[in-house]
UniProtKB/Swiss-Prot annotation:
Protein's name in the database: Spindle pole body component 110
Residue(s) carrying Phosphothreonine: 18, 64, 68
Annotated segments matching region Calmodulin-binding: 900-927
Domain of life of the source: Eukaryota
Keyword tags: Coiled coil, Cytoplasm, Cytoskeleton, Nucleus, Phosphoprotein
Gene: SPC110
Organism field: Saccharomyces cerevisiae (strain RM11-1a) (Baker's yeast)
């Protein structure tokens, strides 16, 4: 139950608001007049019919909450932390002291303890940290700039591709907007047709109503005219049938429009497919780009291989020079031996012959060395020719760049032409919109004419029977004219169907051309894949040739080393011969003969080695010739591929020109057809005007219906023509976009090298400037750091004492914050226990009151306090008396009650205290955080 239903009169004034409910105040006040400002006056002004007023407590001026006074139950928290009482004076009563309370620590807080200054001391450490960060940042910058120089070139190329893609997306969005505009125009035309149909239905209803009125009036006038009216009604029924046929035709036209909308959707799907094909072509073009880059890399590798061959040839030249020097040294030694032999006259002629043989062999060796030198010179000439061929290829590439630029200009011209055509088409659409507005005006005029017809219809009732007969004759004539017009209309429909059939045939032809182009593209892709395979095979062959060549070079080096060893052995033997000649002049002839035989054998071995080397050189020549042939074949294949690509591009351009010519011819034919239609329309309009002059009210309405149907046909035709022109423009745009994309990519690939070189030069200049500026800034920072190092050395002595002060102040603040938190939790617990006790008491009272109202006897074990049974409000044996004038008691919870100033003041005071406590708490937390950071930084571990 609600609280207001149980309280007696004036009991709410004795309650105090709490977050849970109302609390009874003390019953110490009297019902006297207000004597002091703290006494609460009687708000009822002594109503006689109201119940007795409850005694109220005289409140003190400072009605703040004291946790020790309000709550009686003990706290459930741990008393490990002492309580802090800041502004509580010591109580004079020694008997009422709470022994559970701990000593007050505010006096300890007020002691003059030397506190640290964390902000000032932290600046030094922050500066040191900045110094270390600066050193690391320099290293990272130096490494990062090196990577950035390599990465920016790739990023610039990617940005170019991204910009092209964005431009293409923008063009596609514009085309979609144009498409939506045409669809909106189509919707407006459909709405206009619906309006015309509604008007036709309204006219038919008016005709029916007027015919009924005429029939009702003529029955009163004449009975003989009924037959004539029936005849007129039959004729009107026939006319209605004709109207139904016209409506059926209109429905057929609507169905045709639906079919056309489906065709539009199918064509949109085709557009999406074409866009997907464009994306595939783009991906194929990118693959071709990668292939070209791969070929360029192979050319670079081969140039590097040629350079390596040059280096190896230079090494061979050095080895040959060393051999020549050795041969010269051997000649000098032989000359010395000859002089010695001349001095010794006892030497025989056989030894002289041996010496001549040795000289001849040495001369042969020199000739072989000269031949090898000539071969090396020839190889160098071949290398120079290869380098010249490479330069020629580079010049051809530059020529291709210029050709691509000219083709780009041609494409720009074609783009301009297409844009002009698009503008013309837009102007035509504007003119057609103007025609639509003219038609709307004509429809309004027809509405006015209908209003006039309504007026004239009332006058037509007085027409005589003779005029009705003449009208019948005119109706027959008009029926014949309608038949003629229907025949013409059927002929026009046949012509339209034939043209639609021709248009479908042209569309099928265009689709066949598209398929052929796609097949050519697939063939080109297959050829490119074949060329890739050939290039890979050639690369593997060249790799094997390199390995064989290196093996042969290693074998030659080994042979040369063996030759050197043999030469050294011969030198040792010559020295031994000298010694033997000095020792034994008698045995010289025998030993020399043996030595000469050995030398002959050695010379034969050397000649065999030379022959082997010559064979190896010839094999190397054949390998080099093969390599040249393969290289020339690759060049010829590349030239053929490029020639084929150029031919394909020319064929595509010719096809574009042919398609443009076809479009022009189609446009001209469409214009001629439109003019013929206009002429026919004018002739028909003249015939209709002639018939309209002869007809009267009923025939006028039929004529209007026919005119409206014709206008609908014209609108449908215009709509169809607009859709056809739109689709043709879309096809042209797609073709031009594909050609543009190809040529742009080719141009960008060829211009990348020049742009990259310029970008790298600009970057190098910027890097130099940045390095100079960084060097100057580093010098200045070094000076500042040296000065600060001197200051830091002076401050190191004071750090130890400051660390102790920081630790002491940190733990002291932490301790006091925990103590305050514990005291706050105790207060909250006591308050909640008190609120629970009051709530349980209130529930018990409510149950007792319910039992009293229902006359339920008390149980034997009554748990309520005796105070509640003795009160004059809540006793069991005292009936609850309601006031007589209940309407005057407007101080319950259901009535608006005015707040007293005291409650507002207490609320404001509580808010101010909470604000102060929050401020102090925030400042203590900030101070704790600063001290913790300082302690961690001083201990050597930093956690960020």
């Amino acid at each position: 139950m609600d609280e207001a239903s149980h309280l007696p009169n004036g009991s709410l004034k004795n309650m105090e608001f709490t977050p849970v409910g109302f609390i009874k105040s003390k019953r110490n006040t009297t019902q006297t007049q207000v004597v002091s400002p703290t006494k609460v006056p009687n708000a009822n002004n002594g109503d006689e019919n109201e119940g007795p007023v409850k005694k109220r407590q005289r409140r003190s001026i400072d009605d703040t909450i004291d946790s020790t006074r309000l709550f009686s139950e003990a706290s459930q928290f741990d008393d490990s932390f002492p309580e802090i009482k800041a502004n509580i004076p010591p109580s004079p009563r020694s008997g009422n002291v709470d022994k559970s309370r701990k000593r007050n620590l505010i006096d300890d807080l007020k002691k003059d303890v030397p506190m640290s200054q964390p902000l000032k001391e932290q600046e030094v450490r922050e500066h040191q940290m900045k110094k270390e960060r600066f050193d690391r940042a320099l290293e990272s910058k130096l490494l990062g700039k090196r990577h950035i120089t390599y990465a920016n070139s790739d990023i610039s190329n990617k940005e170019l591709y991204i910009n092209e893609i964005k431009s293409l997306k923008h063009e596609i969005k514009e085309l979609r907007k144009e498409k939506n505009d045409t669809l909106n125009n189509y919707d407006t035309l459909e709405e206009e047709t619906d309006d015309l149909k509604n008007r036709l239905q309204a006219l038919e209803k008016e005709l029916d109503a007027k015919n009924k009125i005429v029939n009702s009036r003529k029955v009163d006038d004449h009975s003989g005219c009924i037959e004539e009216r029936e005849q007129m009604e039959r004729k009107l029924a026939e006319l209605e049938r004709k109207l139904k046929t016209v409506k059926d035709q209109v429905l057929e036209l609507e169905n045709n429009s639906d079919v056309q909308s489906l065709k539009l959707r199918s064509k949109e799907d085709e557009l999406k497919n074409l866009m997907n094909e464009l994306n595939e072509l783009k991906s194929n073009a990118e693959e071709k780009d990668t292939q070209l880059e791969f070929k360029k890399n192979e050319l670079r590798k081969r140039t590097n291989e040629l350079n390596e061959l040059k280096i190896k040839s230079d090494e061979m030249d050095l080895q040959l020079k060393q051999k020549q020097n050795e041969s010269k040294r051997l000649k000098d030694e032989l000359n010395e031996l000859e002089t010695k032999f001349r001095e010794n006259g006892s030497q025989s002629s056989a030894k002289e012959n041996e010496l001549k043989m040795l000289k001849n062999k040495i001369a042969e060796l020199e000739e072989e060395i000269s031949t090898k030198n000539s071969q090396l010179i020839a190889k160098e000439g071949k290398l120079a020719s290869l380098m010249a061929q490479l330069t020629q290829l580079e010049s051809k590439l530059n020529q291709r760049d210029s050709q691509l630029g000219s083709r780009e200009e041609e494409l720009k011209k074609t783009n301009d032409k297409l844009q002009k055509d698009i503008r013309i088409a837009r102007e035509e659409t504007v003119s057609k919109d103007e025609r639509i507005t003219d038609l709307q005006k004509k429809v309004k005029q027809l509405e006015n004419d209908l209003f006039v017809i309504k007026k004239t219809h009332s006058e037509s009732k007085t027409i005589t029977d003779n005029e009705l007969e003449s009208k019948d004759k005119l109706i027959k004539i008009l029926e014949n004219d309608l038949k003629v017009a229907q025949e013409k209309y059927s002929k026009m429909e046949k012509e339209l169907k034939e043209r639609e059939f021709n248009y479908k045939i042209s569309e099928s032809k265009l689709e066949d051309e598209k398929t052929t182009l796609n097949e050519k593209i697939s063939n080109l892709a297959a050829e490119n894949s074949q060329l890739k395979n050939k290039i890979e095979d050639n690369s593997t062959a060249t790799h094997h040739m390199k390995e064989n060549y290196e093996k042969q070079l290693e074998s030659l080096r080994k042979d040369i080393e063996e030759y050197k060893e043999s030469a050294k052995d011969s030198e040792d033997k010559i020295e031994e011969l000298k010694i033997r000649i000095a020792e034994n002049s008698a045995k010289v002839s025998e030993k020399r003969s043996k030595d000469i035989k050995q030398k002959d054998e050695q010379i034969s071995d050397l000649t065999q080695n030379l022959k082997l080397q010559e064979d190896e050189i010839s094999s190397l020549k054949s390998i080099i010739d093969r390599y040249k042939k393969d290289f020339n074949q690759l060049k010829s294949e590349q030239s053929n591929i490029q020639h084929d690509l150029n031919l394909q591009i020319l064929n595509l351009e010719n096809k574009l020109i042919e398609s443009e010519d076809e479009l022009k011819s189609l446009r001209d034919s469409q214009k001629i057809e439109i003019e013929n239609w206009k002429r026919k329309y004018n002739n028909l309009s003249l015939e209709n005007d002639r018939l309209l002059t002869e007809k009267e009210s009923a025939s006028d309405k039929e004529r209007e219906i026919s005119i409206l149907n014709r206008k609908l046909d014209e609108m449908d035709k215009e709509k169809w023509n607009l859709q056809e022109s739109k689709e043709k423009y879309k096809r042209e745009l797609q073709k031009v976009i594909t050609a543009n994309d190809r040529l742009r990519r080719e141009k960008e690939e060829l211009n990348e090298n020049s742009n990259n070189i310029r970008i790298m030069e600009d970057k190098m200049t910027r890097i130099k400037k940045n390095y100079l500026s960084e060097i100057t800034s580093l010098q200045e920072e070094n000076r500042r750091l040296e000065e600060r190092l001197i200051l830091n050395e002076r401050r190191k002595d004071n750090d130890s004492t400051m660390q102790l002060n920081d630790i002491i102040s940190y733990y002291k603040l932490k301790y006091h914050s925990e103590v305050r938190h514990n005291n706050d939790l105790k207060v909250i617990n006591d308050y909640l226990n008190k609120v629970l006790a009051l709530g349980t008491r209130r529930l018990r009272l409510d149950t007792r009151k319910g039992e009293h109202s229902l006359n339920i006897s008390l149980p034997d074990d009554d748990e309520l306090d005796r105070d509640y049974y003795n009160s004059h409000v809540y006793t069991r044996y005292h009936d609850y008396e309601y006031p007589l004038r209940f309407n005057l008691n407007r101080r319950g919870p259901y009535f608006e009650r005015r707040l007293s100033f005291k409650t507002v003041a207490l609320l404001v005071l509580a808010c101010v205290r909470m604000k102060r406590i929050a401020f102090y708490r925030r400042s203590d937390d900030n101070r704790l955080r600063i001290l913790r950071d300082r302690i961690e930084s001083s201990s050597g571990r930093i956690s960020w």
